[in-house]
Amino acid sequence: MTARLAVVVSGFPRTSETFAVGELLALARADMLVRVYATKSGDGAAPQPGVAEMLPLLRVLPAGDAAQQAAAMVEDLGDARVDGVHGYFAHRPAEVAALAAGDLGVGFSFSVHALDARKVPAGELADRARAASGVVACNTDVAQHVEVPGAHVHLLPHGVDLARFRPRPHPDSDGHLRVLAVGRLVEKKGFSTLIDAVARLQVPCLLRIAGTGAEHARLAAAIDRHGLNDTVELVGRRSHDELPDDYAWADLVAVPSVVDSGGDRDGLPNVALEAMASGRPTVVSDVAALGAVVRDASSGPVVPPGDAAALAEALTMLAAPSARAELGVAGRRYVEEHFALAVCTRRVVEHLEAMHSGALEPVDA
């Protein structure tokens, strides 16, 4: 009998959490998803493809502490058959999932991504991991962070849609190196370092930064200070449907992530995998799992985080089309082998099915 799960997420839907939609859709299509509970509302942005299919199953829990939200969830489920509860992040969603599972008398599991693991005190996270039926880690960096004696941690990376993000012809050259960066305008994305790097370049360059966030004014001021208003453009939020065209515009994609002043960092940002799937070279920082994946893929240079000079040197190295061609091919081949969405989501579904249906050994990656 197929296991039936209630899943607790954070805000839903959110532009920055495309991976959640793909995995939830896979659970729903496998007839494993009872309901999706969000601990708060989403970001109000244009939803990703597939979100509409999820909306009939979505409930936004009333504001309150974790115990109150868990109680509301249990009441809403009523007599529905639930074989397990999965928290999609290690902080509040996992806490609510654990409490609701206890009330329902079933097991719980949770996923861990990046900042969510660092929002929970180390001792509390370790206890939660040991109490869970299993933990799903989406990259090696965070897997190591949550691996403790007695915990069952499984590395199951998110995938990328290889049909949506595919190689397209490069733009006609106008003599400029076209650089794209995508992400929320927050400190950990390292976009201020990227702007500083572009200011150092001795080759003609056009930089587009796609996203919105609290750092907008600071980044705009940096662009003005460097005299780059004709070189760097903050293009705002891009929908999931617009992103393939953005990658097609670019000669390469920069992912200059840093560890921010609060200790937050990216794990393995979607943009890096989408860029590789699109056949574009990647220039990335050596942060968390990002540098290791790009080195393994041979899809572009890896530079120290926050080092504008090193980033400028890497961009200059890729100014010639001949220097970029093989990197884009290598990146596409790598994501086809390791991050195909259908394969990755199937592994997550099989893992959760095995875990919550009482199989002795959960399916590993």
Language model: regions and residue ranges:
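Acidic anion/phosphate-binding donor-loop and adjacent secondary structure
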Residues: V120-G123, V160-H176
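Nucleotide-activated donor-binding/catalytic signature segment of Leloir-type glycosyltransferases, i.e.
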Residues: A220-E242
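Conserved acidic donor-binding segment of nucleotide-sugar-dependent glycosyltransferases
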Residues: D296-A297, P301-A308, M317-S322
